[in-house]
A protein has these predicted regions:
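Low-complexity, flexible helical/coil segments
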Residues: 20-28, 44, 111-115, 277, ...
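Histidine- and aromatic-rich segments of cupredoxin/plastocyanin-like copper-binding domains
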Residues: 30, 37-185, 190-191, 255-258, ...
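Extracellular/periplasmic metallocenter environments
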Residues: 1-15, 113-169, 238, 261-318
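Active-site pocket scaffolds in enzymes
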Residues: 98-110, 197-318
Length: 318
């Protein structure tokens, strides 16, 4: 089971974006499962990697549709799958306009034809439903007939259907249709210099992070509130990585600049090779209850790919 908190503040409430819950603003929780002949979920932990199912569920429903108002529609996306990453697109080729990521709004909307969504990652998109008829969001190619037959005899990692959601516009187009704002937030300005660089390798054949499995009695990293660090994350196999209690910016992915849709504040990132993060420690932890950083692939975290982070309060000036 998975749920979603929608956290608003004065900035988000003032944004000229759809905000009528259930009319033009919808939470979308995506999961892959494996169901038996009676529709009951089956789970067999893999020896390596993470669990991959063959049935796509959205808000607990297979191949759902929703009636939406004509105009802009806002979808708040969450990948709540154990390990599967999705590449989302619209069936008629119209763009997805990305407006927010894990921890807040992007500086400006980013129009994309395809949008990746890693386990644990959150994104917000808006879609123009003012013209045309219904449109579907899909997540890649569905299993062919031979794949489906093979799936009757052995577990399959190929999705039976890649239909995420169908949007069906209803009603009349408003007399006035707002355009998307050109800007959402001012550009991110780094206040302060990087005080330290750390490197972490997420293993699988050798479980753990940097060859060490999680130990609740051990602190793996210490930092000070209000400082910046450079974290370089390597992965032996593609997986998502999450850090609690921080906000970070993706500086580069395998040596290339981050995609425009990944330039907002984040706490979860897909690692396929190496990524470089600029990590800002904005929250104080407790020595008794440290923050965690870990593989967002559920089974890999269970096998020990996690570490503990203590963030100490900034010194007071007296």
């Amino acid at each position: 089971l998975a749920g979603m908190w929608l956290v608003e503040d004065e900035v988000s409430k003032a944004m000229p974006l759809p905000s009528h819950y259930g009319v033009d603003d919808f939470p979308i929780i995506i999961q892959d499962k494996r169901l038996d002949n009676f529709g009951v979920p089956e789970y067999d932990p893999p020896a390596k990697g993470g669990f991959i199912g063959d049935t796509l569920l959205v808000n607990g429903v297979q191949s759902p549709f929703v009636e939406v108002s004509r105009g802009w529609v806002r979808l708040r996306l969450l990948n709540a799958s154990n390990a599967r990453r999705y590449t989302l697109q619209l069936s008629d080729g119209r763009p997805l306009h990305v407006v927010a990521s894990d921890q807040g709004f992007l500086p400006a909307p980013v129009a994309v034809q395809q949008l990746s969504l890693a386990p644990g990652e959150r994104r917000e998109v808006v879609i123009d439903m003012s013209q045309g008829s219904e449109v579907s969001i899909t997540a890649g190619e569905s299993a062919g007939i031979m794949d489906r037959l093979r799936g009757l005899f052995e577990p399959s990692s190929i999705l039976i259907s890649t239909l995420v959601l169908t949007l069906k516009p209803t009603g009349l187009l408003p007399l006035v249709t707002d355009n998307l704002p050109m800007r959402l937030l001012s550009d991110q300005i780094l206040d302060g210099s990087v005080v330290r660089t750390r490197e972490f390798r997420l293993g699988d054949d050798l479980p753990g992070i940097n060859g060490v499995i999680w130990d609740m009695s051990r602190v793996d990293a210490q930092a000070q509130q209000g400082t910046w660090e450079r974290w370089i994350i390597h992965a032996d196999m593609p997986q998502a990585f999450h850090i609690q209690g921080v906000s970070f910016l993706v500086k580069n992915v395998n040596g290339a600049p981050a995609m425009a849709e990944d330039r907002g504040w984040k706490d979860t990132v897909w690692v396929d090779g190496s990524v470089e993060l600029l990590v800002y420690f904005n929250q104080v932890s407790s020595e008794h209850f440290p923050f965690l950083f870990y593989s967002q692939s559920l089974e890999m975290a269970d096998r020990g790919s996690a570490g503990q982070l203590v963030t100490q309060a900034a010194p007071t000036l007296g």
